[in-house]
Amino acid sequence: MRFPRAFGFLSILAAALFFGEAEAQPAMDTAAKTVTLQMPATPEPARVTLDPKSTALVVLDYVEDICARQPNCKNKMVPAMTPFMERVRKAGLTVAYGTRAQNQTMWLKEVAPAAADIRVNNTAQDRFYNTDLDKELKAKGIKTLIIVGWKISGSVTYTAVGAMVRDYTVVIPVDTTAAATDYETTIGFYNVLNSGNANLGNEPLKPKAVTLSRTDLITFQ
C-alpha cells in the first residue's frame, strides 16, 4: 500500500517532536527545581529607655474590622499591647491614632483612644501623608515615636519612613505589629530596618532611624 507523501511528512514531524521533547525534558526538569532562598535574620530586639515628654505612641489600625480577620492581630498583638498601653498611659506619653475615617469608631477596647489623644483620618498607608500628624506632634515637642499596629509590611513601615524623613527617631516593638504570615512579618522587619537611615545592626535609638524593640524591653524615664 502506498501512503500519500503528506502522511510520510507528518510521521517524520511527529517523530522529531517526540524525540526533541525527550531531549529537552532534562533541561525542563532542571529549570523546574525549587530554589530555596535564605530568610534574612531579624536582629534581637534592643532595650531602650525613653523620655515620656518627648516620646509619642502612634497606634495604627487596631480596629475591629481588621483584627477580627487577622489571627496574628488578635492572638499576638493585642495580648502584648494591652499591658503596654496601660504603662504608656501611666507614664503620660502623647498618644496618636491613625486609621481610615470609617474605622474611627471601631478601635479595640484594649487600646481605645482617650478624649485628649490625637486622631488622624488617613487616605494612605503613611499616616503623615496629607494629615496634620507631624504638625500636632511637633507642637508637643515630640522627637521619638513608638509605632505599633497593623501591619509591619504595610502601614507601620510606610509611617516609619514618613517619620524618619521628618526627623523623628522611631521605635517599633516587635510584639505589637505583625502581618498575615511569619514570612511577611520577617520581610517587613528587614525592610523597615533598611529604609531611610538604615539600621541593619539595630543600634538602640539610632537618630532618625528605626530600632526594633519589644514591650518588655521599653522603659520610660
Residue map of PLM features:
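Surface-exposed cleft-lining segments at the edges of enzyme active sites
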Residues: 66-73, 146
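Acidic/histidine-rich, surface-exposed loop or edge segments in extracytoplasmic proteins
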Residues: 57-69
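A short alpha/beta connector and helix-capping loop motif
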Residues: 53, 70-88, 93-97
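Bacterial N-terminal signal peptides
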Residues: 8-18
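Active-site-adjacent betaalpha module
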Residues: 25-56, 83, 102-221
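Bacterial N-terminal signal peptides that target proteins for export
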Residues: 1-9
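Sec/Tat signal peptide C-region and signal peptidase I cleavage site
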Residues: 18-24
